[in-house]
């Protein structure tokens, strides 16, 4: 999982990327291609 300051550019890297908020953190998840997972921090 990548940890980035800004997820804006990562969101557009793949069509199926989803932006979710869990426990005050912002994540990008991708079920079909998990290598695009990222967390903002």
UniProtKB/Swiss-Prot annotation:
The keyword Transferase does not apply. It holds the Pfam family Ribosomal_L36. GO terms for biological process: translation. GO terms for molecular function: structural constituent of ribosome. GO terms for cellular component: ribonucleoprotein complex; ribosome. Signal peptide: none annotated. Keywords: Ribonucleoprotein, Ribosomal protein. Belongs to the bacterial ribosomal protein bL36 family. This is Large ribosomal subunit protein bL36. The lineage of its organism: Bacteria, Pseudomonadati, Pseudomonadota, Alphaproteobacteria, Hyphomicrobiales. The gene is rpmJ.
């Amino acid at each position: 999982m990548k940890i980035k300051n800004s997820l804006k550019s990562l969101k557009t890297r793949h069509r199926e990327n989803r932006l979710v908020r869990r426990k005050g953190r912002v994540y990008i998840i991708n079920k079909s291609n998990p290598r695009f997972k990222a967390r903002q921090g």
